Each structure stands twice: as C-alpha cells, then as structure tokens.
Amino acid sequence: MENKEIIAVIDLGTSNLKCAIFSFGIGELPKLIGFSKKKTKGIHNSIIVNMNDAIDSVRSCLIEAEKKSQISLNKINVLIDPTEIITTRLTKFKKTSGSKIEKNDVSFLLKEAKKQVELNDSRLSNIHIFNYKYVVDNKLFKDLPFNIYVDQFSQENVFLGVPKNILKNISEVFHSCDIEIGKFISCS
C-alpha cells in the first residue's frame, strides 16, 4: 500500500466486537480494506469484565481484520460507550475591557476549564471536549467571533469523562495484543 495512510478502529460498545481497517491517499475517500465482527467475550458495555476473555476476543477480531486487509496493525482507535460516562459542563468568563477576542484567549479559557475539571475529579479521564456556546457582551453566539472588540465573553465547554480504571483495563487488553491505542472515541 504505497503512499497510503491506514486508519483502524474497533468498536467495544456492543455485544459484538467490530474492527474496520481503512486505507486512503491524499484527496481520496477512505476505502474499507478489512473488516471483522466477533461475539464479545470478557467485555460488557465497553467495560472489561474478564481480562483473559477480553484479550482473546480482541486478538481474534484484530487477526481476522488484519488477514482480510493484508495489513499488520500497530495502532488502532477504540470506540467505547461505557455506561459510566460523566458529562460536565463548565463556563469560564473573561473580561477584556474593550480589547479584541483572540484565539489565545479562547485557548486560555479552555485550558483553565480543563484544569478545573481534572482537579475536581482526578479519577476521570476526559476523552472528548466540546465548545458548547459562547456569550459575547451578553449575546449568545454559536461560533465565537474573533477579532472583534468586546467587554467580556464566556465560553461553555462540555467534557465527557470516563473513569481512568476503565481506560487502563482497555489499554491493558490492547497492550497484551501488542497494539497501541491511538485514541478513545465515545460512540455517544
């Protein structure tokens, strides 16, 4: 697969494991080159309930998809949908006293919000962060208008967190299968 990128995903959120491997080049749509579906054992609602069964299930699903695609994977993205997802909304404010809103202002507020959420519950790992809404001089905006003069603005973010032990157990399964997790993606 010369000059082709490979993306692989595995879905742990159902009663069946589903693994898909895609290839694509610059300017191309992804093409499915390998797929497998196996009955889940040792995993319930994206939670590892039996480590050995989970390792066997994941390994079997990966091997079948790799054979079909003729690719040996070293990294995969993991789709999860655990019932323990915690959603947190947090709004951060900034007074600008008539100066322009810049991207670094938004980045600063996001970093502060993330830090506050992490300090509030260190048992959680944030897998997704969404910008939910912006309020600029008491007016609601879907997208933040940059480079305009304002007195104050706020940014509301939504954080999706999962208990770290759930992610550690999933990581252990994939480590035992000699494959790195690229990222966790929530199906919700």
Where are the regions a protein language model picked out?
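Nucleotide/phosphate-binding catalytic cleft detector across ATP-hydrolyzing
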Residues: 1-16, 20-76, 80-188
